[in-house]
Regions:
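Juxtamembrane intracellular "pre-TM" segments in multi-pass secondary transporters
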Residues: 2, 186-217, 241, 435
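Extracytoplasmic gate region of multi-pass secondary transporters
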Residues: 27-28, 210-266, 323-327, 331, ...
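Helix-breaking motifs and short loop linkers at transmembrane-helix boundaries and internal kinks
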Residues: 39, 71, 92-98, 126, ...
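Conserved MFS/SLC helix-loop-helix module at the cytosolic interface between two early adjacent transmembrane helices
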Residues: 58-94
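Structural signature of the two symmetry-related core transmembrane helices
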Residues: 74-88, 282-298
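Cytoplasmic helix-loop-helix junction between adjacent transmembrane helices
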Residues: 102-142
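Helix-loop-helix hairpin linking two adjacent transmembrane segments in secondary transporters
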Residues: 137-184
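Symmetry-related core transmembrane helices of the 12-TM Major Facilitator Superfamily/SLC fold
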Residues: 163-180, 397-415
């Protein structure tokens, strides 16, 4: 790919990731009207995120292998077509089960995005520019989530939640043609030195022999538990506990996600490329510090009294900004320790673990905890009915899982920082523990 085409390629992939997370998080802004229409518990609401995420995780590995061996461009275009069309069809459902089935299909399409796109970017940009490029790509997470909340909440209040799902599907009509016009780089095109070529082990086992990968996988599960729990229930928390309307909650959550997420991602990208020149563990160590800062900020934000929405939003979203630094820093670290030919497979393994062990539990366990705490609050008050006031108490108390796991995330990242320098050196040394470099 010619250097003049790099900005356009990155811009289109960035736009794909925006739509990816717009459509993935759209239900977060719509949970309250959906709950009331279908008479659902928070556990059932959490399952709308958890069950599709399990399928997403399982689909990611074969799609990652396909991205390493076939056309990433065609795979991405097909994924966009599938997830966008099924998001729109979700606006036609008449039952909770039909909505769940539509979301299962959405997540299968989305499973093609991250392994193929991050592998593509890894082949576009050399190591010294890769952190910024991946950070720009991952800005699609907060921007997509922010747009989803800011547009879908007011749209649902004006026209109903079904219309908001149809709106979410429309940008795909422009993105798919733009994606198909890109030139896909050759695998390993950005490398300035040839990685190790010898290993008898299959790629999956070679990847899992890298000590740092286990800490990265653990960190991925922890960060995704937090961020998916937050994405699912934050607007509902603002509505129930702080008294905002569905439209207000969506708008202010969207603004917070955009400002904090963009700031965190931009800082991570610039800092990650700078610190790697000074110390090989710099990216992992920086991510650990960011998670450590996020924990008390989230704790104080959740502890704000009912009605104190402004302070709560500000503190929790600043914490989110620090957590969002994870992507630009850690995704680049993954590329530092594996060979180009197995990048998509590596990302698929990583996503399998982080979504199956993290994101899949975030919405469901937070929802179950919320239901349990709401029942306890009602029982303590002598009420046989779990009304809206007790649901607000239950969800508020369940949110405390986020700062606790942010602290655990910092520990996992720090542990990974202790092993990454040796793994980066080992990548370029032939031998039984080197990651396979497949013949192209």
């Amino acid at each position: 790919v010619h250097s003049k085409n790099l900005p356009r390629s990155l811009a289109v992939l960035f736009a794909v990731n925006i739509l990816n997370f717009y459509d993935r998080q759209v239900l977060g802004a719509l949970l309250e009207p959906i709950r009331k229409e279908f008479h659902l518990s928070d556990t059932q609401l959490g399952a709308l995120g958890t069950l599709p995420i399990v399928l997403y995780a399982l689909a990611g590995l074969p799609l990652g292998r396909l991205a390493d061996s076939g056309s990433r461009k065609r795979l991405l275009a097909a994924g966009v077509a599938v997830w966008a069309s099924l998001t729109g069809l979700g606006g036609l459902v008449q039952s909770y089960l039909m909505l769940l089935v539509s979301r299962l299909g959405v997540y299968v399409g989305e499973a093609a995005c991250a392994p193929a796109a991050t592998s593509w970017i890894g082949d576009l940009f050399p190591a010294e520019r890769r952190s910024r490029a991946l950070a720009i790509f991952m800005l699609g997470v907060p921007i997509g989530g922010a747009l989803s909340y800011a547009i879908s909440g007011p749209a649902a209040q004006a026209w109903g939640w079904r219309a908001a799902l149809v709106v979410a599907a429309l940008p795909a009509a422009l993105l798919i043609p733009a994606l198909l016009t890109l030139d896909e780089p050759a695998r390993g095109a950005s490398e300035t030195r040839r990685p190790a070529t010898a290993t008898a082990a299959p790629p999956v086992w070679s990847i899992l022999r890298i000590p740092t990968m286990w800490w990265i996988i653990a960190s991925g599960a922890l960060v995704n538990f937090n961020l998916y729990a937050l994405a699912t229930f934050f607007p509902a928390f603002l509505t129930r506990y702080h008294g905002l309307s569905v439209g207000q909650a969506g708008l202010w959550a969207g603004v917070g996600y955009a400002v904090a997420g963009i700031a965190g991602g931009a800082i991570a990208g610039a800092w990650g490329d700078r610190v790697i020149h000074k110390r090989k563990d710099g990216r992992m160590l920086s991510a650990a510090v960011a998670a450590l800062v996020a924990a008390p900020l989230a704790l104080i934000g959740i502890r704000q009294p009912a009605g104190g929405a402004a302070a709560s939003i500000a503190l929790i979203m600043i914490a989110y900004g620090f957590l969002n630094m994870y992507y630009g820093l850690v995704y680049s670290a993954i590329h530092d320790i594996v060979a180009p030919a197995v990048r998509a497979t590596t990302m698929a393994i990583y996503f399998l673990a982080m979504y199956l062990c993290g994101a899949s539990f975030g919405p469901l366990l937070t929802g179950r905890l919320s239901d349990s705490l709401a029942r306890s609050a009602a029982h303590a008050a002598g009420s046989a009915v779990v009304g809206e006031a007790y649901r607000a108490i239950g969800l508020h108390q369940a949110m405390y899982v986020i700062p606790a796991l942010s602290a655990a995330l910092a520990l996992a990242l720090y542990a990974g920082s202790r092993t990454i320098a040796a793994d980066m050196a080992r990548r370029d040394e032939p031998g039984p523990r080197a990651v396979v470099q497949s013949a192209q």
